[in-house]
Regions:
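Hydrophobic h-region of N-terminal signal peptides that target proteins for export
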Residues: 4-16
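Intrinsically disordered linkers and flanking regulatory tails adjacent to Zn-binding modules
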Residues: 62-65
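Small Cys/His zinc-coordinating "RING-like" fingers
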Residues: 37, 129-132
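Primarily the internal scaffold of c-type cytochrome electron-transfer domains
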Residues: 21, 42-54, 68-124, 133-425, ...
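Short N-terminal segments immediately surrounding and downstream of signal-peptide cleavage
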Residues: 17-37, 428
Length: 433
């Protein structure tokens, strides 16, 4: 044996092994496979093609050994992140620290979530279908088992689809597509039509070399396999502290936070701020923002010059400032309707501001328009700016917000005019009596 071989052997022996549960022998899955080959053959096919099968990780490693016949299927355990952590400790630990882990808490915190149809909530046919990847308490998991047929307690399979559980699949941008698309978060559409997405497509078709830079969602949001998946501006592009030396932006951000119910009419924190903290939906310190911004900048500079990358991020921040001014003006117009009695403030609203988190449950057309302005058009402009998609910024975001504000102002004028006419007619009717 050469000295080099000996050195390599010693080095490998000294390397700490990744924590991994001793896998089930593949033969132990034979009984499960024999039955499920007939009842659910594609599940078996996926498992057989998986890395799990190659390593001898069998059905009972994840589902337990209590289910043995067709009459006791309810005894099969449904895996949760702790099941995966038996072998994938670092990845699950990163997930638990990150944004996706708070997805269930975030959707449950919405003030009108309980108004929605059961199938939309716990039935996983609407909001719950994506937000179910978040961690649940024992009580929440029990509730899901009672209302959703026992499903929805898993998390990792949102990206590593069962029963293949492929790392290669989860590394592709399409893995993000199911949840990050559509009305309020069309990141897929933005990415796919951006230069980043286009180059990824061209790389796949071998139109450009295999060595070409072609960032995917994971390149920018899961650097080196980081499962925390955080961004500096968070999901809604709101954060603390307020900008120093910029009174206009500070005033606008205060108004938006009042519309979100995070600040009261005096600008003081409400109980919702604690909910925001618990759900980790926003960066609430400069240090937290700077940490995520530094990670983003480091990623950008792998393909771009540092000066260009910094300027693009700066331009994105500046756009949010301008979007916030339009949004705050819209909120102030609707709040003014409450204040002068033109609109009755809903009894369940804690302050004389429209509650942006009621979303489509907003009670009047003008408040519905404000909801669309916030959750569709502001989101598209903000997200488009950071997904290299100028068309989304302009025509699906900025332009629509300008139109929203014009229509909100016109609606407010019409509501006040109608109220004045009604008062005059009522006074005239009384004078005739």
């Amino acid at each position: 044996m050469t000295s080099l071989t000996i050195a390599l052997a010693l080095a490998l022996a000294a390397t700490p092994a990744a924590k991994q549960k001793a896998p089930n022998k593949a033969g132990k899955a034979d009984a499960c496979v024999a039955c499920h080959q007939g009842t659910s053959p594609n599940i078996v096919a996926d498992w057989k093609a998986s890395r799990h099968a190659t390593l001898g990780v069998g059905c009972t490693d994840c589902h337990g050994a209590d289910h043995t016949t067709k009459d006791d299927a309810e005894r099969a355990k449904l895996p949760n992140p702790d099941t995966c952590a038996q072998c994938h400790e670092a990845q699950v630990a990163g997930f638990k620290r990150g944004k996706h882990a708070f997805a269930w808490a975030a959707v449950k915190a919405m003030p009108t979530f309980h108004y929605q149809a059961l199938a939309v909530r716990e039935g996983l046919k609407g909001c719950g279908g994506c937000h179910k990847l978040g961690l649940k308490s024992e009580a929440e998991a029990k509730e899901l088992k009672e209302t959703a047929g026992g499903y929805g307690v898993a998390s990792c399979d949102a990206c590593h689809t069962r029963h293949l559980f492929s790392k290669a699949e989860a590394r592709q941008p399409e893995a993000c597509k199911t949840c990050h698309m559509g009305f309020d978060h069309p990141q897929w559409e933005m990415y796919d039509s951006s230069k980043h997405g286009v180059r990824n497509d061209l790389k796949r078709t071998k139109t450009i070399p295999e060595t070409s830079a072609a960032p995917t969602c994971q390149t920018c949001h899961m650097q080196e396999g980081n499962h925390e998946v955080r961004t500096a501006w968070g999901f809604l592009a709101v954060r603390l502290p307020f900008p120093e030396g910029d009174k206009q932006w500070t005033d606008d951000r205060v108004t938006i936070l009042q519309g979100l119910g995070v600040l009261d009419p005096a600008g003081k924190p409400t109980g919702r701020l604690e909910v925001v903290k618990a759900a980790d939906v926003a960066r609430l310190t400069q240090e937290a923002f700077d940490k995520e911004r530094a990670k983003t900048l480091d990623t950008c500079t792998k393909c771009h010059g540092a000066g260009f990358a910094k300027e693009q991020l700066k331009q994105g921040d500046g756009l949010i400032r301008d979007l916030d001014h339009l949004m705050a003006e819209g909120i102030r117009v609707v709040a003014g309707l409450y204040q002068d009695g033109t609109l009755a403030k809903p009894a369940n609203y804690a302050s004389p501001f429209p509650d942006l988190l009621t979303f489509h449950d907003a009670p009047t057309p003008v408040e519905q328009k404000l909801f669309v302005m916030f959750l569709e058009h502001r989101m598209r402009a903000f997200q488009g700016a950071f997904h290299a998609n100028p068309d989304y910024v302009t025509w699906y975001g900025w332009s629509e917000m300008q139109r929203d504000l014009t229509e909100i102002r016109a609606a407010a004028d019409e509501l006040r005019r109608a109220k004045k006419v009604d008062a005059q007619l009522e006074a005239a009717a009384k004078s005739k009596k």
